[in-house]
Amino acid sequence: GADVTPAGLPFVPNMPTEEIFTAPRWDGVNGRVYAALPLALDGNLVRNFYLDFQNGKIVNVHAEEGEEFLRNSIQLDEGSSYLGEVALVPYNSPIRNSGILFFNTLFDENASCHLAFGSAYPTCVRGGEHMSEEKQKEAGLNQSANHVDFMVGTSDLSIVGTTHDGTEVPVFVDGNFAF
């Protein structure tokens, strides 16, 4: 998740940041995900929503409030209906512990694990920032004019990684890093 200044110095452009992020394969997400916090979307609130994914694409949307705004954002362009980011943020982060919901993604994303539908960050793939859009897509990166973060982290979130040999490794236990 780092970047490089024109002078060649590495830096993390989101300060302060609590997240470790990457890009999922644009066509590799399946299942249902529930939002843990409301989403402020272009001045409108979306509450208590979930998204269903099939082969990476959002195929079903439900929200108790603001569903039409969520649907409109997902339909902005073809890439808006695919994920571009997966970010891990411990539940006990300073932003979460403040107890404040800012309704501003740049702050709220540091309070919770989150996903984003829309564009992926090219820096998530080695050399991605120097690839053509076609090569980025081949490398698994989603492209869109949109990038909308929504929070999924909860106090009971469990994440288990699987290594190449099939070994399961706890990554998150009870909302926080397992190590």
Describe each model-derived feature in a short phrase.
Residues 1-179:
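Metal/cofactor-centered catalytic core regions of large enzymes
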